[in-house]
From Swiss-Prot:
Pfam families: Ribosomal_L20. Binds directly to 23S ribosomal RNA and is necessary for the in vitro assembly process of the 50S ribosomal subunit. It is not involved in the protein synthesizing functions of that subunit. It comes from the Bacteria. Belongs to the bacterial ribosomal protein bL20 family. GO terms for cellular component: ribonucleoprotein complex; ribosome. The keyword Chloroplast does not apply. This is Large ribosomal subunit protein bL20. One of its GO terms (biological process) is translation. Keywords: Ribonucleoprotein, Ribosomal protein, RNA-binding, rRNA-binding. It comes from Prochlorococcus marinus (strain MIT 9312). One of its GO terms (molecular function) is rRNA binding. The keyword rRNA-binding applies. Gene3D superfamilies: 6.10.160.10, Ribosomal protein L20.
Length: 115
């Protein structure tokens, strides 16, 4: 039976991991075993944080809306409840951008909701 040499396959596998480890510090970019561990950890963190990013941005938007709503004499929960009751359909991202970039428009929304 012919001898099977796995040089190319093993080298490709290692180079794939080492390429993913570019930019890491110390032996984490050069040594295969530590690079492999760091890459696996990085991929796990990236997977987790892609989901977490959505939560973090929603929290940020809510904080911004609440701060601007309090400046205009109401709070977040009353504002959102009033918007639902008066059938104003603006999502939290757009509302936060309005509060940040166009306070006059946000103030009009708050006044129309509170009436």
């Amino acid at each position: 039976m012919a001898r099977v040499k796995r040089g190319n396959i093993a080298r490709k596998r290692r180079n794939k991991i080492l390429n993913l480890a570019k930019g890491f510090r110390g032996g984490n970019k050069n040594l295969f075993r530590t690079a492999n561990q760091r890459v696996m950890k990085a991929l796990c963190n990236a997977y987790r944080d892609r989901r977490r990013r959505k939560r973090d941005f929603r929290r940020l938007w809510i904080s911004r809306i609440n701060a601007s709503a309090r400046i205009n004499g109401t709070n977040y929960s009353k504002l959102i409840n009033g918007m639902k009751n008066s059938e104003i359909i603006i999502n939290r991202k757009m509302l936060a951008q309005l509060a940040l970039n166009d306070p006059k428009c946000f103030e009009k929304i708050v006044s129309s909701v509170s009436n």
